[in-house]
Amino acid sequence: MDHFEYKQGELYCEDVAIVELAEKYGTPLFVYSRATLERHWHAFDSALAGHDHLVCYAVKANSNLAVLNLLARLGSGFDIVSGGELQRVLQAGGRASSIVFSGVGKQANEIEAALDVDIHCFNVESEQELYRINEIAGSMGKTARISFRVNPDVDAKTHPYISTGLKENKFGVAFADAESVYRQASKLEHIDIIGMDCHIGSQLTELSPYIDALDRLLALIEKLRAQGIDINHLDLGGGLGIRYRDEEPPLPAEWASALHERLASFDGTIAVSYTHLTLP
């Protein structure tokens, strides 16, 4: 439930008329519902109860400091894609230990800043980025915790412009190359491999793509563990859809229920990133 509704043709947020807020504060005006944010965050958190987990808010969705502060007080993790987002999360009270650094094109100064505050991990997009992080960590006398973004080559059945998990999409390490890249990373002095990450797309209205991607990742994790490369952090990205017209996207509880059976044998932390919390 979103706490926005129409009453006699007027839009209300948490029983407050938007027109009254506009008259009081002027326009343009952005109105966020605290009750909606809290409800949606708790929906994911509760759905994953029983398994060690970290619910991460994708800061690119809305980096308003008040929104970030609310989520920090809930105990949320944060998925960032820039040094600026890192600073905003910290300024808003977020814990560095709950931050994962995703995204392509991480700059050297951004990597340094993230290492300096000891974030949870980097979601590494490529072999080249891996070597860059190793070099920077070494120059700082630190070890970088990393998770590779693996492209599982799964059709998310969403709009092609927001699909990110197919082989032809330009994100992450190709599934066919992932095992080799993990082996290379395991030899680097300033790298600590902790996890595996994937993001298959946005506005997902079916669960089957998630399940297909998870099955592929779990099979890869078993191969790596047999080689002494332990994966204890699994980051499942991709946005559950919202209703624009007649879509019926799965609820977080339905999503989690579908995953639990497959995750029963995984003894690490499950991280999930979400971006749709602020949408009315």
Residue ranges with predicted function:
Residues M1-A144, R183, K187-D192, A219-I229:
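A charged N-terminal "starter" segment
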Residues A58, R145-N151, D197-H199, D235-G237:
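Short beta-strand segments
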Residues V117-V124, T164-F175, L204-Y210:
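Flexible, glycine/proline-enriched loop segments at strand-loop-helix junctions
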Residues E129-L188:
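Conserved anion-binding
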Residues I200-G201, L234-G241, S273-Y274:
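Glycine-rich beta-strand-to-loop/alpha-helix junction loops that act as flexible
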Residues A258-L263:
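Alpha-helix-loop-beta-strand connector modules within alpha/beta enzyme cores
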Residues T275-P280:
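Conserved small/polar residues in nucleotide/adenosyl-binding loops
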